[in-house]
Amino acid sequence: MPIKFDVTQEHIESYPNFCIVTGVFNDSYLFPSTIQIDKMSQGYISSLLKRNNFNGSINQHLLLYDAPYFFNKLILLIGCGKKNEFKSQSYNTVIHYIINFCKKSSITKILLLLSELNIDGYDNYWKIRNSITLCNNECYIFNKFKNINDVTKKNITYEIISYIDKLDNNFQYCKQAVKDGLAIAKGLNIAKNLGNMPSNYCTPNYLSNKVQELSNYNTDLDIEIINELQLKTIGMHAYLAVGSGSIYPAVMPIIKYQKNPKGPNTNPIILIGKGVTFDSGGISIKPSDKMDEMKYDMCGAAAVYAIMSIVSELQLPLNIIGILAVSENMISSKSLKPGDILTTLSGQTIEILNTDAEGRLLLCDVLTYVERYNPEIVIDIATLTGACVIALGNHYSGLMSNDNNLSNNLIFASKQTRDYIWRLPLDENFEKQLESSCADIANVGGRSGGAITAACFLKKFAHKYKWMHLDIAGSAWISKNCVKSSTGRPVELLTQFLINISKI
């Protein structure tokens, strides 16, 4: 369900066909805009609130039809709780409730009078951009493979306008929030759509072609596709081993964006996304329960693809390289086996103890490959370990890094976007779990601290630059109440991180 979003300083009378949405705090404390509407309707709202015992509790609502002396047919009053307790989470809750109520009520034109809400530490830019991404998430639906007869499942367009007071001198800043918000929302949908594609459609070839298509309509992005033969010539044997059992050859698409005003040779920021289009576990096969969800094992690559589209649209003054580590982990007579030993691009050898720990085999060779770019920062994004889901659930992505300042900056961006991350430790005690009797390193370190030992494995290949690892195994998709969908995380988080860097 697509959305159109804009801001306006025109009088609300200019939007007679829109449902006016305004708020009421606890104990019927009216917003300034609600007071204005009440006066225009000659006290109709205040008297109605008293008769209906409407006290402004959070998410309490009252939909008014044809208020007297008022030009709009619909007014939605939404409870916002106690004024002194209204926080950023309260704002998100209210927006979420409004959009869901309007969807159920078939209201498609919405005029929000909520910018006057005061939230400590958050300005109108945040409120507007956050409203856009929240509305986009609530309206998102993946129905590509459904035969649609039900009108409620069709792609209905929602038109949402946020009113900004005429006394607000930062209207252009609000317009920028719309531009940024719509670009991020579009990117989130791109990531979700890719993540939700079934693996018989979204093969390594499909992802490679999607990246190649970017150059057809975006001249700011340079595309390079490294094929299986080239990967072998380079010496990326760990990378190639992952897809050895698949009929689809491994591939490594690279997306380059160079807009740093200091020139194209300025050290780039590199994003690496794990793109296992289906992960059967290989010889160490996964349980059949929920194996269908292993189509989501390419959500890291989908996120990188989406972020590169966003930064190009926003024209961020940075040099950024996005790399999609794409393969399929299947079973055949050629598959990687437990006990095998691989020689990586770095020269380090790996003993394979579990073929279901395949993502790190892709990433370790890419982490070595990117040394040629002399990167400023490297961030890998991967649905890497079930252990991270056990540790952090579905609410937080796991962060592990070799740089404290970089980690703090990413944590700050996570608070800005409410796409939360939690930093986990990296130290030598965990590295001991990866010791091998016959190779330089084992590819797993036992059950304890699995998310951390996976990051410790990657750390051995990322010692020449500032590096962060995001384990999104718990946050990349949702699976509950018969609903399964990619979330698009951490697209907004990393986009905000890049926006923050671009302003330094």
Swiss-Prot record:
GO molecular function, one term: metalloaminopeptidase activity
Annotated positions binding Mn(2+) 1: 279, 356, 358
Gene3D superfamilies: Leucine Aminopeptidase, subunit E, domain 1, Zn peptidases
Assigned EC number: 3.4.11.1, 3.4.11.10
Keywords attached to this entry: Aminopeptidase, Cytoplasm, Hydrolase, Manganese, Metal-binding, Protease
Disulfide bonds: none
Task of the protein: Presumably involved in the processing and regular turnover of intracellular proteins. Catalyzes the removal of unsubstituted N-terminal amino acids from various peptides.
Name listed for the protein in its UniProt record: Probable cytosol aminopeptidase
Species: Blochmanniella floridana
